[in-house]
Amino acid sequence: MPPGRKQGAGCWTCRLRRKRCDSVQPVCGSCQSLEITCYSGEARPSWMDGGSDQKHMSESIKARIKHNAMLRRERRLMANEDHDIIMTMETDHRAPGELMNSGSALGASSSSRVSNPVLEYDSLADSSASTPSTSSGRPTTLRSSVDRFDEGQSPLTVASWASGPPTLSSGYSASSTRPAVPIQVQLGSAMIYLDYVFPFLFPFYQPSLIETGRQWLLGLLCQNDVSFHIASSLSAYFFSLVPQGDDQDMHDDCKALVWDKLIEQMDLAIGSIQSTVSAVSSSGARTPLLDKTRIMQEITQLLIVEVTVRNNVNWQIHLTPALSIFDEIFKSHGLDQSSKPSLNILSHALPSSIPVTTQHHKSLPNTADQSALTFFVSLLLFVDIMASASLGTSPTLQSYHESLLPSQSDQDFHISLEKVLGCQNWALVAIGNISALCAWKRDAKRGGNFSIFRLVSLAEPISQALERGLKDLDTSPPSPQPTKTSAGRLEAYYSRHDKAIDHKFTANITRIWAHAAIIYLSVSLSGWQTNNNEIRAAVAQVLALLEMIDSPGQLRSLSWPICIAGCLALPAQVPAFRRIVGTMGPLGKFGTLSNALSIMETVWNSRDSIDSNTWDIASALSIIGSPALLI
C-alpha cells in the first residue's frame, strides 16, 4: 500500500498498547512520535498470542518508550541553554517513594561497626544493592559496568584503573542494536556536574589554578564508568529539581524516570565497589597506595550521593570501610619520623605523573591525585565528626585531629576545612570533642562511675576553645586584598578564584558552626533545656547569621547547625526556621536540609514528651527512625 494510506483498525503496536492509532502506513503517527517500531500489516504477529510473548513485547515497548524519552530530554537539555524543557511521556512508571522503598534494604545492615570493615564491605553492600535490569529497555550510555555484568565479568577491579578512562561510545552498542547516547549528551551531563552540581554540594571549595583547580574531579569521573554514570545521573536529578520558570516544571513522569535511573546507577556503584574492595582485600599489602586512595574516594563519593538523594539510608556501611582505608593508608604511608600522621608525607608518597629530573628550590604544584587526596581526607575528617554527633560516639579519626586539623595553619602541609566546607578547623574539632564527651558521659553512667565534676572539667577546655575561636573571629582583620597593579591582578587571578568568597563571610559561616557547637555542649552538660540562657543566646545568634545567607548551596551546607539550633528553638522562633529552609524551594530535596527540617518538625511536635534529663542531640538526630548524617 502506498505511504500515507490508512488501513484496518490500526497498527499492532498501538493495539498492544491499547492506544488510538491513525492507521497511517507504513508508520503511524503515534509510533513515529515515540520513535518505536510500528508493526503494521494484515497478518497477526506471532507475539500477539495473548500470552507470555505478548507480555514480553509489551514490556519491551514500554522500556523503549522510556529510553527514547530520556534521549529526547537529553538532546533538548543540550540544545536549550535556558533550560526551557517540557516533556510528556506515555508510559507507566514507578513513583519515587516506591523506588526509595525498594532501596530500603540499605538500612537492613546492623548499625554496629564491623570487625574488619574492608573485608566485610562486600557482604554488607550485598544487602543494599539491587540487581540491575538487563532487559533490552535499559539505556546504553558508556560501555559501563552493566555490560561487564552481562558478560559475567567483574564490574571493576584494581587493574581497571590502569587501563585508562572510560570510552565514550558512539553508534551502536555491541550487545544491542539500540543507538547509544550521543557523546555530546554524555559530556554535557558531565559538564553540568562540574559546573553546577559539585559547586552546589561544595560551594566553598574554590581551589586556585596553582592547586590544579578542579581538574582532579574530571579525572575522578573518567577514572571508571561507575563514577561517570553516577555523576551524570545526579546531574539529571539536580536538573529535574531546578525551577524552570512559571508553568514549565518538568513532567512528573520524567522526574520519576530520572529518579529511576539515578537509583539504578547507585546500585550499580555498590556492586562495583564491592568487587573492588574484594580485589584489594585479596591483594592485601601489595595493593598500591594510589589504588587504595582511589577506592577510598569511590566509597566516599557514593556515600555523599546516597546521603544527598536518599532519606534514612544506612550510611554507616559506606563510612566504616572508608574510614578504615583512611586509617590504613596513613599508618602504612603517612607517618613522619615521630610516628605522627602527615598529609605532606602521604601526598608525596603518591606517584607523580610529572617526571622531575632536576632539583627545584620551590615546591611544585599539586598533581591531580594529590589535590583529590587532600579534598577527600578533608571530607572524611568532617563526615566522621558529623557521624560521631549522630551516633553519640567519639570520632573514629579523633587521633588525627591534633596533627591534621590544627587551630592555626603553619607552613606544614595541614588540612584547612575552611577551604572545603567554609568552616575553620577549631569549630569542627570542638564538635568532635563534644561527641567524645557525650560518649564518655554515657559510658560512665553505664559503669556507675559518673561524676558531674569530672564532666565539667572535661567540658571546660572545649568551652574555652569555642570562646577563644569566636573572639579571634571578632578581632582578626580580613585577609588583605591584592594590590591593584597589573601583577597584583594577575596573581589574584591564578592564585585565587576570581569569585573567591570573602573572608568576612566565611567568618560568619564559622560563627554559625561555633554557636551550634555551644548549643551541643550546653545540652551535653545541662540536658535538653530550651530556656537555658546560653542555649537561647546561641540559637538567636545562629538565626541572625542565617538571615545573611542567600545562596542555596551555602544554606544546604549548614544542615547540621540549622538542625541543632532549630531543635532547641523557642516556639516563637520556629516560623523563622521554617521560612529559612523554605527559601531552598525544590532544591531543598537535593541534600540533607529537608531531612534536617523533618527532624526539627518531629522534635517540635514532641516537646511535651521529651525527657530533658535523658534527651540529647544524638536522640534528636535519630528521632525519625535512624541516625541522620547531616552533611
Curated annotation (Swiss-Prot):
PANTHER family: PRO1A C6 ZINK-FINGER PROTEIN, TRANSCRIPTIONAL ACTIVATOR PROTEIN UGA3. Keywords: Nucleus. InterPro entries: Fun_TF, Zn2-C6_fun-type_DNA-bd_sf, Zn2Cys6_DnaBD. Transcription factor; part of the gene cluster that mediates the biosynthesis of pestalotiollide B which is part of dibenzodioxocinones, a novel class of inhibitors against cholesterol ester transfer protein (CEPT). Acts as the key transcription factor within the cluster and positively regulates the expression of the cluster genes and the subsequent production of dibenzodioxocinones such as pestalotiollide B, pestalotiollide C, 1',2'-dehydropenicillide, 3'-methoxy-1',2'-dehydropenicillide and 1',2'-epoxy-3',4'-didehydropenicillide. GO terms for molecular function: DNA-binding transcription factor activity, RNA polymerase II-specific; zinc ion binding. It comes from Pestalotiopsis microspora. Coiled coil: none annotated. It is found in: Nucleus. The keyword Nucleus applies. Induction: The expression of the dibenzodioxocinones biosynthesis cluster is positively regulated by the transcription factor dibT. This is Transcription factor dibT. Disulfide bonds: none annotated. The lineage of its organism: Eukaryota, Fungi, Dikarya, Ascomycota, Pezizomycotina. The gene is dibT.
